């Protein structure tokens, strides 16, 4: 048993490092928080769209229908891109990318800039397609 314990501990630590975003979870970060949303929940939200919908993936890998803007995740805080965003920092903004990682980074950046109603599509376009919804290529 003593020989197995270090391997078991290592397996637990490694599996924790590969965690995926929890859908519906509010993600607390240094300057505030953003919320992860599932593909199914986003599809429901799209029926009464009351948000700015932004693809932050780079390079281009497709779009979800009704996307409002495409801004590279690492350029979302640049003044010419900020000028495309709502002036109201409480406006709802939903971000997505291919897998969810770039949109998490962009969500954190927008929260650090004072935006308070940021949503992230957990799993990105991959999750969207896996849920049976289409992508415009």
What is each of the regions a protein language model found here?
Residues 2-6, 17-51, 59-92, 101-137:
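Rhodanese-like catalytic fold shared by cysteine-dependent sulfurtransferases
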